[in-house]
């Protein structure tokens, strides 16, 4: 701290990155872009998947059991494996090179199980009396889900999204292989 404070300057947050001026601002901006685009891709898919699994699919069906096992398995995979998958699938196979889109899709695949699981648990945590009251007032299944269940489950869903943001910002292994390391 004593040696670092004298080195703080306005150049530390300039838009130009060079070997002489190693600014942090391009990295911060790229992190914000990456986080926003990943959430834009993963949150709708995750929430709608959770709605389907919690509200529409039969809990005892073989399909739902397979999806839940796959979701739990994907949650435990290390980020380096996701990075290698993204590298092979997007950087090499699709010939995208190191790019923001390769990093975004890889991170979206990585946080999707987290968003699905937390959203599914939040939706299942909504008391059935809310659903029954909505049906009793004449609302259909879709209206009940979007007007009653989702607003009631929103705190749990937002908790999952915040956890996903933390994972997106903290994962470097997946980005080294897909988005590269040098800010441009």
Where are these regions (language model features)?
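Periplasmic/extracellular loop-to-transmembrane helix junction in inner-membrane transport proteins
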Residues: 2-38, 60
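Interhelical loop and adjacent transmembrane-helix boundary motif
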Residues: 15, 175-184
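Hydrophobic alpha-helical transmembrane segments of multipass integral membrane proteins
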Residues: 29, 33-41, 45, 49, ...
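Generic hydrophobic transmembrane alpha-helix motif, especially the helices
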Residues: 71-108
């Amino acid at each position: 701290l004593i040696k670092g404070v004298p080195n703080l300057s306005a150049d530390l947050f300039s838009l130009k990155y060079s070997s002489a001026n190693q600014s942090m601002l391009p990295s911060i901006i790229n992190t914000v872009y990456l986080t926003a685009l990943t959430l834009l891709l993963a949150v709708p898919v995750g929430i709608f998947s959770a709605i389907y699994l919690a509200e529409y699919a039969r809990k005892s069906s073989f399909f739902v059991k397979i999806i839940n096992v796959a979701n739990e398995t994907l949650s435990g995979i290390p980020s380096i494996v996701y990075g290698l998958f993204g590298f092979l699938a997007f950087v090499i196979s699709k010939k995208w090179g190191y790019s923001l889109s390769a990093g975004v899709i890889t991170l979206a695949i990585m946080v999707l199980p987290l968003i699905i699981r937390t959203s599914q648990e939040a939706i299942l945590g909504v008391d059935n009396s809310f659903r029954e009251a909505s049906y009793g007032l004449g609302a259909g299944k879709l209206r009940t889900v979007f007007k009653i269940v989702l607003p009631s489950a929103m705190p749990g869903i937002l908790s999952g999204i915040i956890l996903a943001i933390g994972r997106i910002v903290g994962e470097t292994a997946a980005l080294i292989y897909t988005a590269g390391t040098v800010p441009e």
